[in-house]
């Protein structure tokens, strides 16, 4: 089946994720289906690279169907996910006359989606927005679940809001324009879903034929893993929208991943690459706590490596690691919470991990 639809069930904030090869070519038709009427103002937020591939055709499709359209391009890179960029979006929104009946469309990767969603949450106290993710990482992770925000010099995503999109449209064809390294980074999040809740997906990713077809970007295989990943995320988000409990398991590998991104400088590692290393650290801690076996850690490590992901821990100062971890949003009552694996497909939340258990992995 070429088209998949997944409901994210959140009461009056529920929405559908539609996965279909080529859906980007007739986006106006999809907007009309979900009740976005003609003549509404649409601010499309993207970046230069994505705009070069899809921008003109995308805007023309909207204009031809009588939508009023403006585009804003975010500079590529984590360093531009900040309040200055947000302020520039507000300026464009004001000049364009974006009102409460208007809509923002995020066309791009995770940075575009995060900033767009937060702009939508805060402009006029909130307007609707749609996610059209164009990277594997944003397809399976950041476009679903409503986490939006920008970075602060003191840490990643410290300024943000939970803001669910009106809809998510995913076109696996856009992955063909990605550098291979970006695709690999997205695979870290897919593998994460396998470790935290979907043993079947993990085993699917281990099969050599599937690996080859995925690396060669075959739509049928891409749709399968995107669909599986989003089903897991949708289920978890529906249980715990605001991350007060079980949703924290989606952060497997992320606490240490954010440390690595922050201390190595945003840009040295892509987000997915940092998460891959973070998953490896969590796996090592799980062995020290007697939670899972060395064989399972090796399976995780080998799978990450097979999709060209790093697992070696960079040299980082121990004191800096503690400082960053204590500033993490996942700290509760002064205690750090870690997501650790018990077996492939099962993880749990722990707040009893002594500093020495993880600091030994850093120089």
From Swiss-Prot:
Subcellular localization(s) per the UniProt record: Cytoplasm
Q: Superkingdom of the source?
A: Bacteria
Q: Which reaction does it catalyse?
A: 7-phospho-2-dehydro-3-deoxy-D-arabino-heptonate = 3-dehydroquinate + phosphate
| One Gene Ontology term from the biological process aspect of the record | amino acid biosynthetic process
Claim: NAD is one of the keywords in the record: yes
Give the residue range of the signal peptide. Answer: none
A Pfam match is: DHQS_C
- List cofactor names only: Co(2+); Zn(2+); NAD(+)
Protein residues bound to NAD(+): 134-135, 147, 156
Q: Where does Zn(2+) bind?
A: 189, 254, 271
**InterPro entries reported for this sequence:** Dehydroquinate_synthase, DHQ_synth_AroB, DHQ_synth_fam, DHQS/DOIS_N, DHQS_C
Q: Which GO terms describe its molecular function?
A: 3-dehydroquinate synthase activity; metal ion binding; nucleotide binding
Q: Which GO terms describe its cellular component?
A: cytoplasm
List UniProt keywords, sorted A-Z.
Amino-acid biosynthesis, Aromatic amino acid biosynthesis, Cobalt, Cytoplasm, Lyase, Metal-binding, NAD, Nucleotide-binding, Zinc
Which pathway, metabolic or otherwise, does it act in? Metabolic intermediate biosynthesis; chorismate biosynthesis; chorismate from D-erythrose 4-phosphate and phosphoenolpyruvate: step 2/7
Its Enzyme Commission number(s) read 4.2.3.4
Q: Which family does it belong to?
A: Belongs to the sugar phosphate cyclases superfamily. Dehydroquinate synthase family.
- HAMAP family with a match to the protein in the record: DHQ_synthase
- Record's function text: Catalyzes the conversion of 3-deoxy-D-arabino-heptulosonate 7-phosphate (DAHP) to dehydroquinate (DHQ).
Q: Name the NCBIfam families on file.
A: aroB
Protein name as annotated: 3-dehydroquinate synthase
UniProt organism field: Prochlorococcus marinus (strain MIT 9312)
